[in-house]
Amino acid sequence: MRSNPTTSGSEVSAVEKKNLGRIVKIIGPVLDVAFPPGKMPNIYNALVVQGRDNEQTNVTCEVQQLLGNNRVRAVAMSDTDGLMRGMAVINTGAPISVPVGGSTLGRIFNVLGQPVDNLGPVDTNTTSPIHRSAPAFIQLDTKLSIFETGIKVVDLLAPYRRGGKIGLFGGAGVGKTVLIMELINNIAKAHGGVSVFGGVGERTREGNDLYMEMKESGVINEENIAESKVALVYGQMNEPPGARMRVGLTALTMAEYFRDVNEQDVLLFIDNIFRFVQAGSEVSALLGRMPSAVGYQPTLSTEMGTLQERITSTKEGSITSIQAVYVPADDLTDPAPATTFAHLDATTVLSRGLAAKGIYPAVDPLDSTSTMLQPRIVGEEHYETAQRVKQTLQRYKELQDIIAILGLDELSEEDRLTVARARKIERFLSQPFFVAEVFTGSPGKYVGLAETIRGFQLILSGELDVLPEQAFYLVGNIDEATAKAMNLKT
């Protein structure tokens, strides 16, 4: 083993006594570290590189492999620029631990739990390791219940499961960020819960934009940071694969504390779950593992399962997770999205066509799905209403080509009625959001599930056929639509 030229022999023996190792090899973000016999760190232990003259660098690594001959292979959580062979490495004796609790709300963290928002240190002594086992089966809450969001289109057609996992599909500029912020706002108001946002391998600009929009809409309260409703954790795409692979676990660890200790309902956002898989693939290649299908890591299912199994409801509280899913080349059979789908309870698909019409939230009512939409779970009334809404919209979709070519007048009386009701339904699925008040000037609306079902039943029954369709656009419950129609007449 080659020693650092600045370190004398007496210092080396002192280093060995202190249970330190030395870097023997550096390949990009991967370090090989040699330790004295009997002083080997465990898998997932955090190692901190010590600079020259015992100055601590900011490079933390995580042990991934035990190579034999008293050597370990570790993956760096930040850039390895400036590191050299022979540098001392401290074995912390524990996995990476991050701050947890109420003082994390309103703050932005990196993968190591260090605040990166220039607001000073986090006021807490409570930390938690990012590697934990999933809750035991006996701790789980197996009762199937709907997680009411107050958003009509979601609650009626693709309801979320409390403690479930939801995939959010949508391109740029269709309202994904606003939908996420509205959900954060509504869980705080209706459920007394909090949210954790994990930015996994996305653009730094997007993270900055989200933070600014959250401050503007009041989700993050700058005056009184403790009243904020969300903690943000970022591992952006310019960071090494180790950071992008572990940042999801950092966010999840913060969410678990709110669930298990504070006994709250928590919303965990992961944007983007595909980047988590991609980072794992990069790390796997760096560690020399043989790639599996389409070049992905052979441990893909295990890594995904380790993360997803910790996201669940327990008897204390729940973590409901909303995960943005990027589908490479729109290929749903790609191993990354295909592995993700196996864990999802619902999908919320955002449509560019609806956004172009000005219907927000631009949730596609026909493409969005949920395993919760069954009569034995949601009840016959909810199920029947949702199915009739979908049938009406599907028939309208089928008739659109005929309308475009021949016009409405060529349709039968029954089809014309279906089209009129479908257009009212389409507009009634829109809704003013609390977080968009600052942009639109319209006050936000939270619509309970019972009110949502009643409103769509009235449209389907034909009782509101005489009202103009613009009365249903961007309103809360059905009573507001009838009041708006009266105003339009006067």
From Swiss-Prot:
Cell compartments where the protein resides: Plastid, Chloroplast thylakoid membrane
InterPro entries given for it?
AAA+_ATPase, ATP-synt_VA_C, ATP_synth_F1_bsu, ATPase_a/bsu_AS, ATPase_alpha/beta_chains, ATPase_F1/V1/A1_a/bsu_N, ATPase_F1/V1/A1_a/bsu_N_sf, ATPase_F1/V1/A1_a/bsu_nucl-bd
Keywords for the protein's UniProt record, in alphabetical order? ATP synthesis, ATP-binding, CF(1), Chloroplast, Hydrogen ion transport, Ion transport, Membrane, Nucleotide-binding, Plastid, Thylakoid, Translocase, Transport
Instruction: Return the EC number.
Output: 7.1.2.2
The reply to whether Kinase figures as a keyword in the UniProt entry is: no
Catalyzed reaction equations: ATP + H2O + 4 H(+)(in) = ADP + phosphate + 5 H(+)(out)
Ligand binding (ATP): G170, G171, A172, G173, V174, G175, K176, T177
MF terms in GO: ATP binding; ATP hydrolysis activity; proton-transporting ATP synthase activity, rotational mechanism
Q: Which family does it belong to?
A: Belongs to the ATPase alpha/beta chains family.
Q: How does it assemble?
A: F-type ATPases have 2 components, CF(1) - the catalytic core - and CF(0) - the membrane proton channel. CF(1) has five subunits: alpha(3), beta(3), gamma(1), delta(1), epsilon(1). CF(0) has four main subunits: a(1), b(1), b'(1) and c(9-12).
Q: What is this protein called?
A: ATP synthase subunit beta, chloroplastic
Species of origin: Convolvulus arvensis
Q: Which gene encodes it?
A: atpB
